[in-house]
Amino acid sequence: MKLSAIWESKNGLRGSGTCSHRRVSTPDIQSPDCGEGGIGHALALDFKNQGYVVFTTLLAHEPRDHLTDLGIHSFTADVTKDSDIEQLKEAISSLTEGSLSVLVNNAGICYTMTAIDTDVKEVEKMFGVNVFGPMRMVHIFHPLLIKARGKIVNIGSELTDFEASYNATKAALHHWGNTLRVEMKPLGVEVVNVISGEVGTNILKRDHNRKLPEDSFYRPLEKEFMNHVTRTPRTTTPAEYSRSVVIEVMKQHSTAWFWTGASSGIVRFSEQFFPRTLWVNSL
């Protein structure tokens, strides 16, 4: 579990410690993306390159030299634990004068399996990170966001084959974000859903050895399944993806639904102008 927090002052003296601050927090929750080459790492670098002071959190066993060597601060925290995030909030609040202008929820674990072959315990674990993690972050950090009249950015995803449960976590995040947007508007906080196309990260690494059950009805598709879980996406890079997200987040008013990443344009077009059953014959 990883979280990045970024802040700068409104008067351009970034990280100056003045009274008028614009602060950004980017949680990268239980994801490889804050490791080198991932989305979280790219976001931290992009905000850093914009002159922000960046705070990140990782699990105790995770290396952080690639962040701290660049002046990016690092905390140890597990964002599935209330106590860890409460402590994190107090630590960040003490450094940012109690306000935060953007919280980016980038849930990141994946469980690849056909819907009818799913191990529900794995799905519960994934929901704990991908859905309940962002909920916990917003619940605990909302006073800082309201004080700053800030933004909440939820990193979502397009649908993909063999990912019914992962798709469900992202659908939950999208719809929760839609309701959250309505509820936070009177409090002066914007909510942005980022709908991500495929990005070249190692999120599938934990699934590389996953196989279909021996008694699965999908055994004839074993080759296609293995190609899916072992592939290395060579499409949008984390750096390209991050740049587009950071540019959108830094706007005075961000788009409610922001599509970015490989194939996001064609998927968005298809969802708007074609029947929902368009993808039924994709396998």
UniProtKB/Swiss-Prot annotation:
Gene3D superfamilies: NAD(P)-binding Rossmann-like Domain. SUPFAM superfamilies: NAD(P)-binding Rossmann-fold domains. GO terms for biological process: phosphatidic acid biosynthetic process; secondary metabolite biosynthetic process; triglyceride catabolic process. The active site is at Y166, K170. Disulfide bonds: none annotated. Its EC number is 1.1.1.-. GO terms for molecular function: acylglycerone-phosphate reductase (NADP+) activity; triacylglycerol lipase activity. Keywords: NADP, Oxidoreductase. InterPro entries: NAD(P)-bd_dom_sf, Sc_DH/Rdtase_CS, SDR_fam. NADP(+) binds at T57, D78, N106, Y166, K170, V199, T201. It comes from the Eukaryota. Pathway: Secondary metabolite biosynthesis. One of its GO terms (cellular component) is endoplasmic reticulum. Highly reducing polyketide synthase; part of the gene cluster that mediates the biosynthesis of annullatin D, an alkylated aromatic polyketide with a fused dihydrobenzofuran lactone ring system that exhibits potent agonistic activities toward the cannabinoid receptors. Belongs to the short-chain dehydrogenases/reductases (SDR) family. This is Short-chain dehydrogenase anuB.
